[in-house]
Amino acid sequence: MRQYELTHAIYTPSSIDAGIAAFGHLCQATAERLVDESVLTITGGDEALDPELLNYILALAAQEILR
């Protein structure tokens, strides 16, 4: 079991919500909204926390920035 905590101002609420919606069946994920950033905590088995999940959230965040 591993846990990742991703904290960065570029993670907008919509990108985090989209990532949780897409991969929530693979792991437990919670998001905490702060004033200028969001904290995403992902907990699950090693197979659930693969780079695909983290890259997906990064890609969504990048799309948010480009809009």
Regions found by a protein language model. Name each.
Residues 16-19:
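Hydrophobic side chains in well-ordered alpha-helices
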Residues 29, 34-36, 41-67:
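Helix-rich interaction surfaces within compact, conserved domain-sized segments
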